[in-house]
Amino acid sequence: MNTSDIVEIQQLMALYGHAFDSPDRSLVAQLFTHDGVFDVTQQAGGSPTDGIDAIRAHLDRWQPLQPSTHNTTNIWVHEKDGEVRVWSKWILYIPADKSTRLGEYNDLVVRTPDGWRIKHRLVTQTVPKL
């Protein structure tokens, strides 16, 4: 992994917030591998969502809370056991109920022919505690 890879991965992390806040669900294909996992098992009643189509459907369930603002910060890209991992913090503001939520993403990212993609994203909410 070189500096160019790190910049591309950071751009991927930035696009995530825009994609989740946008009604344009085609952006999801620029984020996840076809068999990607969006894992919210750390949330109350959450379960993993497997595959791009299922992730799009998951986002559609959140549409009533739009507009929202997903922000990703403190992005740390590192190699561990031969895999590329990303650890970052997130801030989510939902104007509909004036709530702010904070948490962490722990990602496994892979290089595909189309660029870097998220293979597995574990979402943990830290504030408010669930």
Where are these regions (language model features)?
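A solvent-exposed, acidic/Ser-Thr-rich amphipathic alpha-helical stretch
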Residues: 25-89
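Short, low-complexity N-terminal intrinsically disordered segments enriched in polar/charged residues
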Residues: 1-26, 30-34
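Charge-dense, low-complexity intrinsically disordered segments
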Residues: 3, 46-49, 96
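A beta-strand edge to alpha-helix "cap/lid" segment located at domain peripheries
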Residues: 60-130
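Short, flexible micro-motifs
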Residues: 20-22, 54, 106
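Alpha-helical elements of Rossmann-like donor-binding domains used by nucleotide-donor carbohydrate transfer enzymes
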Residues: 15, 54-57, 104
